[in-house]
């Protein structure tokens, strides 16, 4: 969706005032369309299936439990779709998740329930690895596209926006239905199910349980860092891949803008939301 088409659709839905407030935060998203296949070509972007890992990397575990591969992204596949050149031009992103007890991302210990790895070395040193039996999803190839997006109504950026009653109706009955397709993507804005996540990432990643934060921990000097968090990857529930995140939820991989610029994926944070 182009910016002009985005504006036109918001106006058609009766959200002119929201567009006027949110247009400064419009971001480009790299959409990821899944197509189930028997075997994904080596080194290509996909959901589920096998991981093309460096030779000396072991399959990630949480104790005795193997993590499941949720997504492998070859950033070279994204070239031409990342309009602001935010992502690396090359390299592999791997996202693994504990499908037994991965947590919601609100507690510091939830860090053990996921792995986000980045490899930008020689492709010749990659080897296809399969998860232990019973711990993998059906493979689905990913095709990249692009669209422009406005912030979700409950995101950190729009926390001070005052919603009129008619705008609430317009959002849920018109806009949300218009954008209701499966939403796998890189970048853009998160499609929230249970509210904003930026502050949750800021707190939990710094060792502070989100629901138990004290008044002093919520002081502006610390919470200001919530604005640094960007959506890196969003994976929706998808019957085609056998992915059902606590029913019909979504997984969100977040990282700070300065970490993305430095290509430091070790500090990502993962949140699970479900209706």
Locate each region found by the language model.
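Preference for intrinsically disordered or flexible, low-complexity segments
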Residues: 1-275
